[in-house]
Amino acid sequence: RETWESGAGGAGGLLTATGFACSASSALTVTIGAGGVGNQGGGTPYTGTDGSNSVFSTITAIGGGAGGKYYLSGFDGGSGGGCGGHTTTAGDIGGSATAGQGHDGGTNVNTGSRDGGSGGGGAGSAGSSNSGIHAGDGGAGLQSSINGTSTYYCAGGAGSPGYPSGSYGDDGIGLVNAANRGHGGTTNEPVNGSSGVVIIRYLS
């Protein structure tokens, strides 16, 4: 499947809260957001989709922004998607992050028409911009031990190479092919983002 010159998906938003009041008699809304669908192959600028929001009661983590395919800018989200590289306009932008939840996607900084895509933003850092035909890296995830094991969540995906001989970017630190991590979709297979997660820790 062709994925030339595409920006990568941004991670879902990462939020934490302590001292949340609840009772056994009160129902709470919990929604696990689906990961975004990756950019489609082929020679048309069909972009992927944003991830869906994850919700715990009044706390909403915004789904990750889709990466821009070819000449499209990245899309906004919890973390922003990376910009596509098939453009002659330096400064085309990555998607913007939601304040307090993540970082922006990488921006196109070149003027070639077949440059690599930029990386998606992560909870720990922004996605990096392309470098000519070489794609940008995904933003880093953040580690948490809330589940008893140190685990990375919400890393950004890697951009795809410029045509015909560029290189892929690196996935954001901590990105693995696993569900319920909130990672952005990478342009290396698999391209879809991972689903979100809600983790509740309480005193017994």
Question: Each PLM stretch: what is its role?
Answer:
Residues 1-204:
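Low-complexity, glycine/proline-biased repetitive segments and flexible coils/loops
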